[in-house]
From Swiss-Prot:
The record marks Y180 as: May play an important role in catalytic activity. The keyword Cell wall biogenesis/degradation does not apply. This is Trans-1,2-dihydrobenzene-1,2-diol dehydrogenase. The record marks Y71, H79, K97 as: May play an important role in coenzyme binding. Belongs to the Gfo/Idh/MocA family. GO terms for molecular function: D-xylose 1-dehydrogenase (NADP+) activity; nucleotide binding; trans-1,2-dihydrobenzene-1,2-diol dehydrogenase activity. It catalyses: (1R,2R)-1,2-dihydrobenzene-1,2-diol + NADP(+) = catechol + NADPH + H(+); D-xylose + NADP(+) = D-xylono-1,5-lactone + NADPH + H(+). Homodimer. SUPFAM superfamilies: Glyceraldehyde-3-phosphate dehydrogenase-like, C-terminal domain, NAD(P)-binding Rossmann-fold domains. The record marks D176 as: May play an important role for the adaptation of the alcohol substrate into the binding site.
Length: 330
């Protein structure tokens, strides 16, 4: 039986997710419906991607009995309300990052998923890339000894994009792209809570963070330094430094195709497509989609790789960092 997907929102990320699904076997994954707040946009998206049903409201999608799981690709500030509505209608949900605007909302969604006994996962697609799988394996094997220091950065000049700078749209470097650095460290340190969070940065004229650096300190004298900006391109690398070596992602840390371990590089190709894509290595979203299918087939209500506890920890760290910078969302 195919996993039947409903797509919530017709933005750029939803386009790439649907294209990524098309690289997987049709016997396993089918997109059966799409919803936008504008019916014409939904119809247009459905026509482009050969989706049978188009809805002019998210509520209709949430109530569609043919859907197994809903992918939420809408803007950040509506995540909480849309995901809650889907959960209340008994739908499994894969929601784009950030899962919600703050940790209180994340806890609310986790509680709702448990109450209604449905699957919920934050769509940090990075975690399902072969590079990330390789990193988890290397860490479990203590390939670089004890991890003492992590560096991660994600910067890209998107300061002209309203979604990235407007406070009402949930803009800002940390919520939009810096969150990938936070999830990376959270993965490496197995969801452990940092002993301290120190953030410094600069605010955009709109009041969101345009540049932010965070120092996380963990027990056992372990440290992570994360940097993110929407004002300039960064090398977008990561480094995990241990007592016996170093693991590096040389570029595209959020959707990587290569990893360097003690100077030796290994490459992994993402699925191929001829369809137009908006995001680098976007077909790699197929990895998270297949993971969701496997979780559902096993009857799981959360992912063992991108757990709800991790989502809560990521949101908690970001809350603390944004508070220190004085970023307040409506």
């Amino acid at each position: 039986m195919a996993t039947k997907w409903g797509i919530c929102s017709t933005g750029r990320i939803s386009n790439d997710f649907v294209v990524a699904l098309s690289t997987l076997p049709a016997v396993d994954h089918q997109v059966v419906a799409v919803a936008a707040r504008d019916l014409e946009k939904a119809k247009n998206f459905a026509q482009i991607h050969n989706i049978p049903k188009a809805y002019g409201s998210y509520e209709e999608l949430a109530k569609d009995p043919d859907i197994d799981v809903i992918y939420v690709g809408a803007i950040h500030p509506v995540h909480r309300d849309v995901v809650l509505m889907c959960l209340q209608n008994g739908k499994n949900v894969l929601c784009e990052k950030p899962l919600a605007m703050n940790s209180a909302q994340v806890r609310e969604l986790i509680a709702a998923a448990r109450k209604f006994n449905v699957f919920l996962m934050e769509a940090f697609w990075s975690r399902f890339f072969p590079v990330y799988e390789e990193i988890r394996t290397l860490l479990s094997q203590k390939a670089i000894g004890d991890v003492k220091f992590i560096r991660a950065e994600f910067g890209t000049p998107i300061y002209t994009v309203p979604r990235a700078v407007e406070k009402e749209l949930g803009g800002g470097a940390l919520l939009d792209i810096g969150c990938y650095c936070v999830q990376f460290v959270t993965m490496v340190f197995n969801g452990e809570k940092p002993e301290s969070v120190t953030a410094r940065g600069f605010l955009h004229e709109t009041g969101v963070d345009e540049t932010i650096s965070i120092i996380l300190e963990y027990s056992g004298k372990r440290q992570a330094i994360l940097s993110s900006t929407i004002m300039a391109a960064l090398p977008n690398q990561t480094a995990i430094c241990g007592t016996k070596g170093i693991i590096q992602i040389p570029s595209f840390m959020w959707s990587p195709t290569s990893v360097i371990v003690n100077g030796k590089e290994t490459k992994f190709d993402v699925p191929h497509t001829t369809e137009p894509m908006n995001f680098s290595n976007g077909t790699g979203m197929s990895y998270e989609a297949e993971h969701v299918r496997q979780c559902l087939l096993k009857g799981l209500k959360e992912s063992p790789i991108m757990s709800l506890a991790d989502s809560e920890m990521i949101a908690t760290i970001m809350d603390e960092a944004l508070e220190q910078l004085g970023v307040m969302y409506p």
